[in-house]
Structure formats: C-alpha cells, structure tokens
Amino acid sequence: LYMLDSDVKVSNSKYTSVNPIVFGIKKSKAKELGFTNKTVKTKDIVNAISNGKLKFSMSNPTSTNSGASAYLGFLYTLAGNPEVLKKENLQNEKLVKSLTTLFTGLERSSGSEDFLEELFLNGNYEAVVTYESSIININKQLQQQGKETLYAIYPVDGVSISDSPFAYIDNKNERAKEIFLDLQSYILSNEG
C-alpha cells in the first residue's frame, strides 16, 4: 500500500512509536573513548574510528530500514545538518571523506535487524548501530548472560528517528472506522 495512491484514502494517521537509531557501544569501550562523560557528536565517533579505536556492526543500508535511516542520519550530520541534502552536499569532499572514514569502522553488516541482534549477541563485537529498542533488547540478553552491556550514544548533532504510524484505510465502512478508532485509542493509551 502506498499512501500517495490517488484511489486510496488514508485517514486518522497517528504515530504509535518513535524509535531513534543509536550507537550501542560496550560500556568499557565507551568509557575508554570518553563518551560517557560528555556530549558526543558524530565527528567524535568518526575520529575514534579514524584512530583505530572503534569498530561497529549495523544492518545493511540497502536492505533494511534501520541501516538506511542510520546512513541518512550520518549523511545529514556530517554534512552539517542542511535543511535539504542537495547534490552539492553529496559532492563535498569533506563529507565524502568523513563518511568513508566512518564506514571503515564497519566490521560486520547484516540483512535484517533480527539477524544483527543475533550476530552481536553471538559474536565479539564492541559496538552496534541499530534501533534504540534493539539496544534495550540486546542489553537485556547480555545481562541475562552475565556479559557487559552497551552504552547508548545519541549524537547531539543528529539522530535518525524511525516512526510507526497507524492509519485507517477508508473503505466507507463507518462501523469499521469506529472499531479502528477504538483500537488506535487503546494502543495510544497508557494501558496499550
């Protein structure tokens, strides 16, 4: 379903969740890098990678939402957060160099967020770029296994956000719309 199709009417769209894309770094590594006692910018992460002090894993930007969102977030912050990314931004040598440097730190990529979590939990990786909710899930599992947990880094110069809208596809059925609105109201409530 594509919301811009002219014959499909979507209404009552509301976000049911908002999930930032963050760096999860093993706490000891984050502390070693000085990331636990200061505000961290994306360039700080790039510098750590450039100095050979940080490697990370993430989902593939060409096949996953979190990977694509992370990539676009990196582009925007390393380009200086322009209102709109333009061709001249993308051709800027400093941006290309920073982005290239950032991705020299990519140790492993995966084709899905679930597989990325599994890879991280079963491997010996020091950092992962993924949804905040995935970092929380990974940390729960690491705690259960008695392993070191991750420290979430939210770069102050920009974080990509993944949102989840819940909308009604209008088929002119008032009873169905009523049921939808009740369900949506419940999902957005404290009990939901």
Where are each of the predicted segments found?
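Solvent-exposed loop/turn segments at secondary-structure junctions
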Residues: L1, K29-K31, P61-S66, S133-I136, ...
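N-terminal segment of the mature folded domain
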Residues: L1-S63
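Extracytoplasmic/secreted proteins, especially bacterial periplasmic and envelope-associated proteins
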Residues: M3, V40, D44, N65-S69, ...
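Periplasmic-binding protein-like
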Residues: Y15-F23, I49, T62, V96-L102, S110, Q143-K172, Y186-G192, ...
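Short helix-loop capping/hinge motifs at secondary-structure junctions, enriched
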Residues: S28-N37, Y76-L85, K172-F180
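Extracytoplasmic/periplasmic solute-binding protein
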Residues: G52-G80
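Ligand-binding pocket segment of bilobal, Venus flytrap-like solute-binding proteins
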Residues: Y76, N81-Y154
